[in-house]
């Protein structure tokens, strides 16, 4: 994306503030005209005081300098007041719009598919969000406070200078050409270099975030020095790339300062020669020196503007790349909110592929009736998780249809669909907020009594009550202030509060010890009552009582039946069971069931 297109898009993001933007632009136009009244009036006053020797296009017949001085004061007051008003409203516009864009960006990335987040580091997304919105804020603020007025000033100044004295105006044009050529060359030379610098900034942010997110691993394996050295290496590489860019722009500063000094001297030299020939007045020489000073100031502002756009361009490009990422699924224009569903789930000839070559799910068909528990088993990559992801529309199938209560899930709003589906993940996901806040994710308006009931049913109330702050206890980052079992039981309580007709359990007890697993299983039994439940199972012991088990291989269901039926067939499932020593333990487990029930009752 070219810098011109990039900057145009920056201005287009003003959106609802466009009206104020046009008002500020008009105010800047008035300022651009008013600013040149000062050098013109200054020159005319000098001519009047020196005996009305003006010979240029702006000859004056005013005999007294006082009217000119009064006009100068009036223009000065207008410039001061208008500049203050522009600065005030530009500040407010930039701050309001930065917060609006930041919120919009956050909402956008939260809607992007899990595959996008899997392949993109969260630290990088945070860096892009903060640096991108800060860059937008700086450009908006600079544009309306300085840069636009500077550009308009150049548009006004050069024709005015030609009108007053074209001979002296040529010197100003030469100065503009030097600035333009030099800036263009440096931008062309350093544009790709600055892009590499921003890539290093992203790597630095991602590496630091990665290390901080795994600080326990770093400390336990004595990797602090290694991580610091790695970060220092990235920082050194960043500086090595940044220094040449800074050197080029320092060269621009040196050459432009030299050019401005030479231009002022040239105006005096040419002006004196013209004055001796009667082609200009002392006032016009003074006026053009003021023009040159003002032109230099505006050119430096324009160069600063170009430099700021250039330096911000890679950050903005990265920001827009994220903003342009398209969510995998969206609401259809005619999508409906289904309110509460019953939970009749039907897959009909469903196929889906991530890469368009190898099917992740192929011709999948099955029905889950309300209240049934459907277990999905199979090797990693067999298609279990993909099938469930299609159910709650993380993706849409390339062929086939998924219906709930006879309604195509694609005809439902995403919010309405997902409100009817609860998920208990293998790793309990908690916010760094209070226990109450984490529970209310399931039901935002839940009362304390409802939370207590849900926590009790999920075997979580005891440990909540033991903490000093009870439901106000902070769970810590990713729930690290709680044990694995406590986190999982809170996750189950959250699902109970949500009270969805369809429940997804992603091997919710795989990482727990036996005692904790017993408590969590009791909680799971409670949350599964009366719901259509899908269990993604790796440990076959957890699905012994499932209504039906679907065995996946290469994206297809190769076996289907109850636990005992599949064992009796001596097929793929039976082989999996033997690998997990299930067959030998089946009779023993059946005999021990009453004892387990009694033990569970005692634990609860």
Swiss-Prot record:
Location of the ABC transporter domain: 345-579
Keywords: ATP-binding, Cell inner membrane, Cell membrane, Membrane, Nucleotide-binding, Sugar transport, Translocase, Transmembrane, Transmembrane helix, Transport
Secretion signal span: none
The ABC transmembrane type-1 domain, residue ranges: 21-311
Residue intervals passing through the bilayer: 22-42, 68-88, 146-166, 168-188, 238-258, 285-305
One Pfam family named in its UniProt record: ABC_membrane
Keyword GTP-binding carried by entry: no
Recorded GO CC terms: plasma membrane
UniProt membrane topology term: Multi-pass membrane protein
Binding site for ATP: 378-385
Repressor is among the record's keywords: no
Record field: catalytic activity: [(1->2)-beta-D-glucosyl](n)(in) + ATP + H2O = [(1->2)-beta-D-glucosyl](n)(out) + ADP + phosphate + H(+)
Domain of life (superkingdom): Bacteria
Written domain comment of the UniProt record: In NdvA the ATP-binding domain (NBD) and the transmembrane domain (TMD) are fused.
UniProt function note: Involved in beta-(1-->2)glucan export. Transmembrane domains (TMD) form a pore in the inner membrane and the ATP-binding domain (NBD) is responsible for energy generation.
Family per similarity comment: Belongs to the ABC transporter superfamily. Beta-(1-->2)glucan exporter (TC 3.A.1.108.1) family.
Subunit relationships: Homodimer.
Protein's name according to its UniProt entry: Beta-(1-->2)glucan export ATP-binding/permease protein NdvA
Gene name of this polypeptide: ndvA
